[in-house]
Amino acid sequence: MLILTRRSGETLMIGDQVTVTVLGVKGNQVRVGINAPKHVAVHREEIYHRIQRGDELACSSGTRGDSGSSI
């Protein structure tokens, strides 16, 4: 795991097309802004896991889940 230190207003790059900007820090919460191409899915971890569980349930029932919806 790469660990970086950024201050509010500073940005980091992931590859050539994804930027993550620290928008603000209040207590133990950090607000980040993410710019990425539309084909790159960006989710909070807990939402990502829900989507994955939904896909597993859809596969086991023989139907396809709606994992393409925006959350």
UniProtKB/Swiss-Prot annotation:
InterPro entries per UniProt: CsrA (IPR003751), CsrA_sf (IPR036107)
Protein name: Translational regulator CsrA
GO cellular component annotations of the record: cytosol
Function (record text): A key translational regulator that binds mRNA to regulate translation initiation and/or mRNA stability. Mediates global changes in gene expression, shifting from rapid growth to stress survival by linking envelope stress, the stringent response and the catabolite repression systems. Usually binds in the 5'-UTR; binding at or near the Shine-Dalgarno sequence prevents ribosome-binding, repressing translation, binding elsewhere in the 5'-UTR can activate translation and/or stabilize the mRNA. Its function is antagonized by small RNA(s).
Organism superkingdom: Bacteria
NCBIfam families for this protein: csrA, PRK01712.1
UniProt-listed PANTHER family: CARBON STORAGE REGULATOR (PTHR34984:SF1)
Keywords linked to the UniProt accession: Activator, Cytoplasm, Repressor, RNA-binding, Translation regulation
Family that this chain belongs to: Belongs to the CsrA/RsmA family.
Compartments reported by the entry: Cytoplasm
GO molecular function annotations of the record: mRNA 5'-UTR binding
GO biological process, one term: positive regulation of translational initiation
Subunit record text: Homodimer; the beta-strands of each monomer intercalate to form a hydrophobic core, while the alpha-helices form wings that extend away from the core.
